[in-house]
Amino acid sequence: MDKKLKIALAQLNPLVGDVSGNIEKLISIRSKLNNDIDILVAPELYVSGYPIDDLVLREDFLNLVESEIDKLVQCTKDNKSAIIVGAPRKDNNHIKNSVFVIENGNIVSIKDKYELPNTGVFDEQRIFKQGSLEDCVTIKGIKFGLPICEDIWEKTVLEKLS
């Protein structure tokens, strides 16, 4: 197997609630990447900032997140690096802590966080609906898992992705 991916990690500090500013920063970073970078990865809940608390319960905020994610979709139409980015999303009547995989002008996959913490400022069980155990995603012919934060410590999640 000679397949390889070049991945850039965007270790950015998003501002909670500054959805447009966070997206602009990520698009700017992506525009400066070398053409040989296959994937740009941003942190959990990067789009909204974290910890998000009750802001994510507002319908207008979730609508803004959705419209700003579309800007990321549009910028990937250049067929350069894919983007993996964390954002809250509305799924029917529930809100999920998700990761979006965006490539070639499309959202090719959405994965939801399974293991929601409920300690201190991490009040995710009150805010988010638990995701299901997710399968792997494939980018450029390479299959890999996308556990989100505490999912890494959950044996059930890792077994599903292995």
Model-derived segments and spans:
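Enzyme catalytic cores with a strong preference for nitrogen-chemistry domains
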Residues: 1-162
